[in-house]
């Protein structure tokens, strides 16, 4: 199974953000055990790095964590077409629309997110971390 994990779920796991961290950490374990293929978008990677560095107040520690994250996840490119197509998406949040376009183009089975309502207008199946 191939899943695209939204930024909020990655941050939940990496910062032990309660009450969501347990289900997010379970997804990481599934990826580590090769039960699933876990992906993030390239644009999410920069957001994740920024948020982790801000949380830790430590650039080197943030880089180390990102390296570990990259060992568990594939990184999906965001194309110009993804960005352009997202402008016409029924998903009102542009960033979420871009993520959904990437997931659709890469044939992801699910987008795993806590932000279900923003993705419902897209064509990719959406699931909460607790339900995954």
What is each stretch, according to the model?
Residues 2, 72, 101-132:
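Acidic, PIN/NYN-like endoribonuclease modules and their adjacent C-terminal/linker elements
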Residues 25, 49-74:
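Active-site-proximal, substrate-binding regions of enzyme catalytic domains
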Residues 43-44, 64-90:
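Acidic catalytic patch
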Residues 6, 47, 96, 115:
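Acidic active-site catalytic centers that drive phospho-/nucleotidyl reactions
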Residues 1-40, 54-60, 121, 130:
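Short, well-structured N-terminal submotif of metal-dependent ribonuclease cores
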Residues 7, 80, 96-100:
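Conserved glycosyltransferase catalytic-site signature
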């Amino acid at each position: 199974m191939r899943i695209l994990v939204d930024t909020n779920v990655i941050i939940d796991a990496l910062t032990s953000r309660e009450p969501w961290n347990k289900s997010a950490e379970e997804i990481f374990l599934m990826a580590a055990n090769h039960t699933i293929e876990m992906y993030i978008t390239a644009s999410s990677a920069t957001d994740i790095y920024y948020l982790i560095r801000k949380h830790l107040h430590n650039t080197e520690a943030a880089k180390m964590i990102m390296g570990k994250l990259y060992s568990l996840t594939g990184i999906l490119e965001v194309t110009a077409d993804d960005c352009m197509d997202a402008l016409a998406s029924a998903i009102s949040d542009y960033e979420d629309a871009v993520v959904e376009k990437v997931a659709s183009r890469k044939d992801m089975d699910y987008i795993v997110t806590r932000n279900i309502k923003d993705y419902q207008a897209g064509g990719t199946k959406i699931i909460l971390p607790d339900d995954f």
